[in-house]
Amino acid sequence: MITVFFFLGCDSKTEKKTTKIPLITKSIGDDGAIIEKGKEIFNYDLDLLAQLPLRNLPIIDSTTFDNVEKSGVYDTGFLKRIKFDPGCKDATNFRLKYKIPFSENFTSIVVSYQCGEHELLTTLITVNKKHKIIDRLQIAYDEIAESAFGKRSQVEKDKIVITSSNWMNEEPIFETETYALLNNGKFKKM
């Protein structure tokens, strides 16, 4: 009984102190300037982009199911944060493949992803410094359901030539489209 009274007596004399730790609502940006949290550039996005290989021009992209795993890194949420819309509801296996040094005013990123089990799309995305998508262009395509359709591209400084192939008939059909990448990061069909 004495023990119980002792603990009760000690409890009544103990003061509980809580220290409030202020929340940090500002962070330091790349240039050392303090920026508000709502405008913060995510460091992990910058780190992720820094990991991507930089490919020099000219580039031939013929990404297929056979070679998609050989370059780049899996997306860990970057595409969602920049509000990338793949154009199909069942898109999976997003992979950031490489960057292209078109301009210092925006970043050019090549992304591959599957639509369903049988289609693989590769898209060139231009993103401004605030991580907003400027434009996008599909530069490669592979499908394994019929293995009859494909797309590949040749990327140069002044133009992007995309060649689509259709092997459904005895004679294959090849069609080319040429695009220019404007100084503002938009693609223009030539």
What residues fall within each predicted segment?
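Short aromatic loop motif centered on NTY/YTY
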Residues: I134-M190
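C-terminal motif of bacterial Sec signal peptides marking the signal peptidase cleavage site
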Residues: F6-G9
